């Protein structure tokens, strides 16, 4: 529609689609566009551990509505009247002319999207501590569906009987449960005095007691010094301040940091 309000949302996983849908309800005549760097969008990131464990049976269930309709670009176009540009990275906010510069990743083609309102919902990335060996094969992080695909593949292959999880926060605990249900032995390494540091120590102790009862080894107040690999470049053990522990798979889960580069480069923060 000519002279319609132009609303552009950067980020298409969690907050972005919610903001776009809300904008559509508040401004039914607006042009609403979501820009998402990855191919998949509007998926249940909190469900990734349960997809790995098999509780979520199929990949598509992470991206489906309660009635099983896949939330893909066609869904947003046909049901929500929202345009989705996936596999498209927002590279620059040109505030002087109110335009967002984007690049289509498969082709490298760039273009400018004019906006009247710009919503930045770029989410966060896993913190990657400078641990020697963190680039070995089978040293993973959990952020995207593709990460969960790889983790689930390794779990179902039964080639990783011993798994080390670095970090005892919420994601680390959910992944501990998932990996245990897959039948692998888990060692959790936490640098701080107890796991789940958002809880009081006595409450965290109850969780830790349960974990030990189901066979999980918990090492608190323990630093990871390095990750050792074999001749093929695959992880074989984790060396900590409490000793060396064999592992065929390592998850680094020590927190997240917000993706603020786009906003910072635009002088917004």
Regions found by a protein language model. Give the residues of each.
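Beta1-alpha1 glycine-rich phosphate/pyrophosphate-binding loop at the start
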Residues: 2-85, 178-199
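Glycine-rich Rossmann-fold phosphate-binding loop(s) that bind the pyrophosphate
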Residues: 11-14, 143-144, 167-169
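Short, glycine/charged-enriched secondary-structure capping and boundary segments
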Residues: 22-25, 47-51, 99-101, 132-136, ...
